[in-house]
Amino acid sequence: MRASARLNSYSHGGNMITLTINGQSRQVDTADDTPLLWVIREQLQMTGTKFGCGAGLCGACTVHLDGTAVRSCQTSAKDAAGKKITTIEGLGGGRPHALQVAWEAEQVPQCGYCQSGQIMQAASLLAKNPDPTKQEIVAHMDGNLCRCMTYGRIQRAIVRAAADMRSKSGA
């Protein structure tokens, strides 16, 4: 099923909610059960967050709610109201985030489909733990799937970004 067809299965229920996405307040009309993913992609036209499985199993749709990584396909827009939502478009605050720079340096992208979810998941790790071990990286990234199997590159990019972020913060 195409993404737009899936969104159309969620009616606009006459419920106006305010979402704070990437620092901007946005009003949307949505049914109570509409996943945040579809509001982000279809109503707000921010397509960096991807639809992967629709069941919260692959991680392609990962965004941050109040700094915590969540699967936007399993989070209703209504539940996200009143929280700070960050998508891949807002991660670097208008500039490339250290993870995005490291992703390119380590040549992580292949098909790129998992990329935004992987980066958002990794960013939540580095926000809590600026110097993770390989085991901590593997454990935190478990559940974010990459069909191109670039897991080694993903891990190296996270280590590189962490080192870059620590050097810039003086840690």
Q: Which residues does each predicted region cover?
A:
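Signature of N-terminal electron-transfer/Fe-S-associated modules in redox systems
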Residues: 6-171
